[in-house]
């Protein structure tokens, strides 16, 4: 077998269906849009969530809550992810970004207590959950809020 003899598997490549190219093609004239009506027109069709005039779901349900414009979103790191560092290492935001555990620092880094930590680490972050702080200190490490 040579490179120029390679062919895709039978049925793996489907040819694009060109509509509106003569009645002999089977998809000419109305091009699969049927006769007249909103969907046959240029730019026709209904918006997402439109229910044909029936009161739509998003209007039937009550309004609730608000969006806090001052909301802070923290980048999250769990305890089990911190096990990759050597025993006695100092884990900083720069180190977390460098290793790829955090791709975007956002408003800061918060350490959560999911998983187990079996290394003695000094962890510097903006926030710690109570369970994460307890687990780090139980492993012999220290936490520092920056």
Curated annotation (Swiss-Prot):
One of its GO terms (cellular component) is cytosolic large ribosomal subunit. Residues 1-13 have a biased composition (Basic and acidic residues). One of its GO terms (molecular function) is rRNA binding. Keywords: Ribonucleoprotein, Ribosomal protein, RNA-binding, rRNA-binding. Residues 1-60 are annotated as: Disordered. GO terms for biological process: translation. It holds the Pfam family Ribosomal_L27A. Gene3D superfamilies: 3.100.10.10. InterPro entries: Ribosomal_uL15, Ribosomal_uL15/eL18, Ribosomal_uL15/eL18_sf, Ribosomal_uL15_bac-type, Ribosomal_uL15_CS. Residues 21-31, 42-52 have a biased composition (Gly residues). Binds to the 23S rRNA. Belongs to the universal ribosomal protein uL15 family. Part of the 50S ribosomal subunit. PANTHER family: 50S RIBOSOMAL PROTEIN L15, LARGE RIBOSOMAL SUBUNIT PROTEIN UL15M. This is Large ribosomal subunit protein uL15. It comes from Lysinibacillus sphaericus (strain C3-41). The gene is rplO.
């Amino acid at each position: 077998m040579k490179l120029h003899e390679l062919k895709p598997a039978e049925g793996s490549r489907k040819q694009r269906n060109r509509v509106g190219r003569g009645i002999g093609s089977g998809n000419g004239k109305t091009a699969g849009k049927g006769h007249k009506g909103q969907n046959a027109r240029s730019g026709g069709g209904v918006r997402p969530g439109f229910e044909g005039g029936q009161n739509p779901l998003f209007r039937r349900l009550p309004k609730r809550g608000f969006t806090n414009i001052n909301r802070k979103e923290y980048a999250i790191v769990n305890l089990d992810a911190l096990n990759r560092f050597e025993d006695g290492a100092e884990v900083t935001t720069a180190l977390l970004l460098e290793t790829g555990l955090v791709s975007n620092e956002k408003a800061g880094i918060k350490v959560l207590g999911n998983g187990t930590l079996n290394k003695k680490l000094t962890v510097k972050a903006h926030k710690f959950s109570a369970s994460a702080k307890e687990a780090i200190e139980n492993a012999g490490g220290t936490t520092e809020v920056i």
